[in-house]
Regions:
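Surface-exposed, flexible loop/turn segments at secondary-structure boundaries
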Residues: 32, 72, 122
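C-terminal capping/extension of enzyme domains
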Residues: 36-52, 77-158
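Short, well-ordered beta-to-alpha junction loops that form the rim of enzyme active sites
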Residues: 66-72, 119
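Short, surface-exposed acidic-centric catalytic microdomains
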Residues: 1-43
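Short secondary-structure capping micro-motifs at structural edges
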Residues: 9-14, 48-56
């Protein structure tokens, strides 16, 4: 794929997602920022998308991949906050990174798995660098980077 911000690149990404039955849906429907940047922490006045309705509408969805964790304004954090409206919570399946949980939808009683992948941002490099699995990879393959670690993590879930 071409990694540019062009019509060709966008078309390639759309085709990839469609061909692999992958949907994208941001949990944040709207937010404001005082400082224009990409950080999650900078979001204010956050309105969350009604993901329960989205999940009930699309019964083929079995897994949600969060690109970020449970830190303030991260996707898992917002999803947990959103679920409280329904009186439901995530059930822990694995505490290892990436953390895996499941939730049972209130209407259909269908199980949805959630996987909290490490964020792709440069700011997440400190967190990656502190992980034991990253340190083990680095000892075995010194030329590998935090991005390589994320790619390996992402591959298992895509």
């Amino acid at each position: 794929m071409v990694y540019e911000n062009t019509d060709v690149a966008i078309s390639q990404r759309k085709d990839f997602l469609t061909n692999n039955n992958i949907g994208i849906c941001d949990i944040v429907a709207s937010a404001t920022r005082k400082k224009i940047d990409a950080s999650d922490i900078g979001m204010e006045d956050v309105v969350l998308r009604d993901l329960i309705s989205v999940l009930e509408k699309y019964p083929k969805v079995t897994t949600l991949l969060f690109t970020g964790g449970n830190s303030k304004n991260g996707p898992e954090y917002f999803f947990r906050r959103y679920l409280k409206q329904y009186g439901i919570s995530l059930t822990n399946i694995s505490s290892e990174v990436p953390r895996i949980h499941e939730v049972i939808l209130p209407k259909s009683l269908r199980k949805i798995k959630t996987v909290s992948l490490i964020a792709p941002s440069g700011a997440a490099n400190r967190a990656v660098g502190s992980l034991q699995k990253y340190k083990e990879m680095k000892l075995k393959y010194p030329s590998k980077t935090t991005i390589d670690f994320r790619v390996e993590q992402y591959k298992k879930h895509f």
